[in-house]
Amino acid sequence: MSVSILEQAGVSAATETIPEMALRAVLMPFYNNLGDRNSSFDLPEGVSQFFVAGAFLVTPDQDWHMLTASLGFPSEQNRLMIPIDGGHPGRVRATGEALYLPDTNAEAGKFKQYLKTARMGSAIYAPMIWQGKFIGQIVMAARARNSLYPKDFALMRAAAPLAAAVYVAKGGLEWLVKMYPPVDAYKVSPEGL
């Protein structure tokens, strides 16, 4: 399954002409297939499992991580903007290393909720590095704890260089300069919501 997901991501992204749509095409197979979707989860009454995915790009002024290619995020957070050193996106940028959080509750006091709809229980962050420079990160999160697995983490790490290459090849660096700052920016503080 892993090779087919990567292949699907690459083939889909190659047909896109807009950088953000190319990133979304890379992420869509992961968003649709990774993680546990059917187990009995330890979720509050009336809450069901759901996933989000996207790419947080470093803005041209280096002040923010800006959400693009969002999947599953609320529409008003289409351009969620997290301060550059905020939360786990800031940690991934600082270290340049991918981050796997099977249970965000295990990160006592460290996990910051930026998603408006819910606190996510599992999360993956994989850096997009282009020619030695950190340009952003792809992310995926699940509402339920322990529902993203090491195999999902490995696939997201493998997808991150593909995402970076596709984004740059489609003119993403220039696209970001032209569209920044976004009119629909949803800025949050480092502390989260």
Residue ranges and their predicted role:
Residues 46-48, 114-120:
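Short loop/turn motifs at secondary-structure junctions and domain boundaries
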Residues 50-52, 87, 123:
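Short coil/loop residues immediately preceding or within conserved phosphate-binding loops
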Residues 58-113, 174:
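Regulatory sensory and allosteric helical modules in signal-transduction proteins
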Residues 78, 141-158, 166-175:
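Regulatory loop-to-helix N-cap segments in sensory/regulatory domains
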Residues 122-129:
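A short, aliphatic-rich beta-strand micro-motif
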Residues 132-142:
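Sensory beta-strand/linker motifs that couple input domains to effectors
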Residues 169-193:
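Signal-transducing coiled-coil/dimerization helices and immediately adjacent hinge/linker segments
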